[in-house]
Amino acid sequence: MKVLGIAGYSGSGKTTLIEKIIPLLVRDGLRVSLIKHAHHAFEVDYPGKDSWRHRQAGCTEVLVSSAQRWALMHELRGAPEPTLQEQLARLGPCDLVIVEGWKFDPIPRIEVHRSGTDARRPLLYPGDPHVIAVATDEPLDTRLPQFGLDDAAAVAQFIRAFVAGREARARPAAAAD
């Protein structure tokens, strides 16, 4: 299982890019999973539903299952938030895990940069040695591979090479130092 982060500031286009590349990777036969980090509380069920009521009553875990999908909700109840590595261990077998968020964990990542949104914020690269490529709407002065924010096909091709272990060949020769 390969792990690849998609990192950038809020509003840079991470989710949109991920939505575009997943179907291309799946079409080529890759089994893709995703972990998204939320900086805020979130709900996956609704107040008043049985599963919500069971959680409110004190269950640590509630698993909801149907013929289409299942979801496991785990209440931390004051316990520390699990690390990315702990969350990765919970996933089933797959070829690629895309990680949205956890931008400071030591995993290879593609940085997503939008000039208007991120103009006053520093790029993660070159300060982040885990950035292996950049998807951007403006040319950047970097030796890393660069892709247009709208060029999902090129990003997907780079990711396929990464999954196949050919990431070094997917990068320009000058960037292999």
Regions found by a protein language model. Give the residues of each.
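The conserved Walker
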Residues: 10
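Phosphate/Mg2+-binding loops and adjacent switch elements
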Residues: 96-165
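N-terminal phosphate/diphosphate-binding loop that engages ATP/GTP or pyrophosphate donors
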Residues: 22-82
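Conserved lysine of the Walker
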Residues: 14
